[in-house]
């Protein structure tokens, strides 16, 4: 269902990987066709988008945790439902576990003496989200992700080449330059002025960015620079996270 062979792993300032050609072409083409319309009312602002005083996100989402219409949307999308069920499966957990171990990242120490499968079954869930960020200034401010997250996978679902080249549409992997933000496990939003970009990950078709939640897993998106041609376009992606119960 997914292919992790064409991957590159990084360790500084925290572990992350870039995987190209993650899906077979036929599957990816179907995902592009089936991606829900971001203008549909079934999409809702992220919680942080509603809290303007925080100013953390400017994005919309449809997910399996909080969106009431998620099951109605996905049940009529054959390929999307197929990959959703795959990402929720133990097979996916095992594939990711083996991938991490092969790249010297071991999160098995969390399990103590319990069965690995039982440990994940009882203690973790998989979060699945259709994400949409407006291309006319949309952004995700620097943050390290919720303490409940263990692993995050971001997969662009795009079919327009011009979106990939927009300034700010990729993901910036960051390092805090202000010492008070160096330890940020609880996911405090960090001013861009207090960060330094370590690596910029282009937002490319059929690619996956995967990173491990740490106290310093700082990253951001945008603000995406708009043009007269992109005001109605969206940065569409599927996000999959392994999260603590």
What are these regions, as identified by a protein language model?
Residues 1-5:
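N- or domain-start disorder-to-order transition segments that initiate the globular core
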Residues 6-103:
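Non-heme Fe(II)/2-oxoglutarate
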Residues 82-85, 92-245:
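Catalytic core of non-heme Fe(II) oxygenases with the double-stranded beta-helix
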């Amino acid at each position: 269902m997914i292919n992790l062979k064409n991957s590159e792993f990084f360790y500084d300032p925290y572990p992350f990987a870039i995987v190209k050609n993650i899906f077979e072409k036929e599957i990816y083409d179907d995902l592009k066709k089936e991606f829900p319309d971001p203008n549909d009312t079934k999409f809702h602002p992220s919680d942080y988008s509603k809290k303007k005083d925080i100013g953390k996100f400017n994005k919309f989402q449809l997910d399996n945790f909080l969106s009431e219409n998620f099951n109605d949307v996905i049940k009529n999308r054959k390929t999307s439902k197929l990959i959703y069920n795959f990402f929720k499966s133990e097979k996916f957990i095992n594939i990711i576990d083996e991938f991490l171990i092969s790249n010297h990242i071991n999160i098995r120490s969390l399990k103590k003496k319990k069965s690995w499968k039982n440990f994940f079954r009882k203690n973790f869930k998989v979060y699945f989200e259709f994400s949409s960020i407006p291309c006319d200034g949309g952004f995700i401010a620097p943050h390290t992700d919720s303490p409940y997250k263990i692993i995050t996978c971001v997969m662009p679902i795009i079919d327009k080449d011009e979106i990939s080249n927009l300034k700010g549409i990729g993901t910036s992997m960051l390092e805090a330059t202000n010492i008070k933000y160096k330890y940020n496990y609880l996911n405090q939003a960090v001013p861009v002025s207090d960060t330094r970009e370590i690596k910029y990950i282009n937002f490319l078709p059929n690619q996956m960015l995967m990173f491990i939640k740490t106290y310093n897993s700082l990253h951001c998106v945008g603000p995406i620079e708009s043009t007269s041609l992109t005001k109605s376009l969206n940065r569409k992606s599927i996000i999959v996270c392994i999260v603590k119960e």
